[in-house]
Curated annotation (Swiss-Prot):
Record gene name: rpoA
Reactions it catalyzes: RNA(n) + a ribonucleoside 5'-triphosphate = RNA(n+1) + diphosphate
Keyword Acyltransferase tagged: no
Record protein name field: DNA-directed RNA polymerase subunit alpha
Organism: Tolumonas auensis (strain DSM 9187 / NBRC 110442 / TA 4)
One function term, GO molecular function aspect: protein dimerization activity
Keyword annotations of the record: DNA-directed RNA polymerase, Nucleotidyltransferase, Transcription, Transferase
Enzyme Commission number(s) of this protein: 2.7.7.6
């Protein structure tokens, strides 16, 4: 009797209904009451957010400087073209990033099949329309950066400080790396012998064709199992506290006096007294500075005000100044 109360039913994969190459229904039963929603919601979230895939992440279109423009001879504006580029289903074999090119002229549609690529790239939906050329002399040329990633990554999340040097005309796209286009689940009633309070989980999902739906669910289940492994054997694992290396001096003290943007007269007076760094300056007193040739009360007031705006003052004591990095210089 005790075993029947504490033992959980183990679900089995009942059916995989392949509705199309990109659309499938997977049925799993029997599940203990409530486990249909528990597992269904977990798998749904993983399938939407954690499936790896490839997507167009950046594009450079000849004659286009920014996304809020249009191109002569092209029916769509640039924003619509960028939106269409996000719909290209692409797979990379053995690479994490490639640069592809597309050049098309003459009236008619421009499709994903017009993209020039090697054997290590597969365009799953070559019929996907990118834009339309409206005249015999119309032409469009672009370079596409395809990257491997996971989930959905907006363009703003991929901006870095070093992107200030990015050439004008390179447009970042919101990258939808996940191959899962749609995922829904339904929990139905199931029965085993006399028990009628069980769950049946039906997962209905579509992909963009770069990943088989059955394989997608298998990967999602593997990810979920790996994440739960840590809970199987809970132990008191103490994580050593990481000691942060605090700088010996405030970084502002290591900056040159020129960064204070003093007047030329004041700056020259300080340099004449070998005061090259802000740390050198804050250790001087008002009396010492007034003894500096050509440095009067007006210059002293200027220096005090500039230091105060940065939370500093004259007459500060700095132990072990100057640091070795400045002494070597």
């Amino acid at each position: 009797m005790l075993g029947s109360v504490t033992d959980f039913l183990k679900p089995r994969l009942v059916d995989i209904e392949q509705l199309s190459p990109t659309h499938a229904k997977v049925t799993l039963e029997p599940l203990e009451r409530g486990f249909g929603h528990t597992l269904g919601n977990a798998l749904r979230r993983i399938l939407l957010s954690s499936m790896p895939g490839c997507a167009v992440a950046e594009v450079e279109i000849d004659g286009v400087l920014h996304e809020y423009s249009s191109k002569e001879g092209v029916q769509e504006d640039i924003l619509e073209i960028l939106l269409n580029l996000k719909g290209i289903a692409v797979k990379l074999e053995g690479k994490d990033e490639v640069i592809l090119s597309l050049t098309k002229s003459g009236a008619g549609p421009v499709t994903a099949g017009d993209i020039i690529h090697g054997d290590d790239v597969v365009i799953v939906n070559p019929e996907h329309v990118i834009c339309h050329l409206t005249g015999a002399n119309a032409e469009i040329s672009m370079r596409l950066r395809v990257q491997r990633g996971r989930g959905y990554v907006p363009a703003s999340a991929r901006l870095h400080t070093d992107d200030e040097d990015r050439p004008i005309g390179r447009l970042l796209l919101d990258a939808a790396f996940s191959p899962v286009v749609r995922i829904a689940y339904n929990v139905e009633a199931a029965r085993v012998e006399q028990r009628t309070d069980l769950d049946k989980l039906v997962i209905d999902m579509e992909t963009n064709g770069t990943l088989d739906p059955e394989e997608a669910i298998r990967r999602a289940a593997t990810i979920l199992a790996e994440q739960l492994d840590a809970f199987v054997d809970l132990r008191d694992v103490s994580v050593p506290e990481k000691k942060e290396d605090k700088p010996e001096f405030d970084p502002i003290l290591l900056r040159p006096v020129d960064d204070l943007e003093l007047t030329v007269r004041s700056a020259n007076c300080l340099k004449a007294e070998a005061i090259h760094y802000i740390g050198d300056l804050v250790q001087r007193t008002e009396v010492e500075l007034l003894k500096t040739p050509n440095l009067g009360k007006k210059s002293l007031t200027e220096i005090k005000d500039v230091l105060a705006s940065r939370g500093l003052s004259l007459g500060m004591r700095l132990e072990n100044w100057p640091p070795a990095s400045l002494a070597d210089n």
